[in-house]
């Protein structure tokens, strides 16, 4: 477990890293690439992602609470059970990622792209009854 609180990362590549339980809380991640990383139970709380991407990462049960992810490139990630409460995720495309059991703020879902199955799951989480 590594704790990198309030750090600045620019043009960093995290490739096949094991970041389980690590904390990047309140850090700036600018032009960073996370590729094929494993990091369940990690914290990206209140992080700011600028021109960054996450691809093929397994980050189940991690926290992105209050993070600024707007427009971050997301592809084929596992976000199962993650906390996105209060996060700015506008413009993010979760359609190729697993978000089973993830928690989102209702207001944050505007302009977020999800696939059909994810839309049904999110509707249930929001208390909608689909008939």
Show the residue positions of the predicted features.
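Tandem repeat scaffolds
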Residues: 1-131
């Amino acid at each position: 477990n590594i704790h990198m609180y309030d750090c600045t990362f620019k043009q960093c590549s995290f490739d096949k890293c094991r970041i389980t339980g690590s904390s990047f809380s309140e850090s700036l991640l600018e032009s960073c690439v996370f590729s094929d990383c494993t990091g369940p139970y990690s914290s990206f709380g209140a992080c700011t992602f600028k021109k960054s991407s996450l691809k093929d990462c397994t980050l189940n049960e991690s926290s992105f609470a209050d993070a600024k992810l707007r427009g971050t490139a997301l592809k084929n990630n596992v976000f199962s059970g993650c906390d996105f409460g209060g996060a700015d995720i506008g413009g993010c495309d979760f359609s190729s990622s697993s978000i089973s059991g993830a928690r989102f703020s209702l207001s944050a879902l505007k302009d977020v792209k999800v696939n059909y199955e994810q839309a049904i799951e999110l509707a249930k989480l929001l208390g909608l009854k689909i008939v």
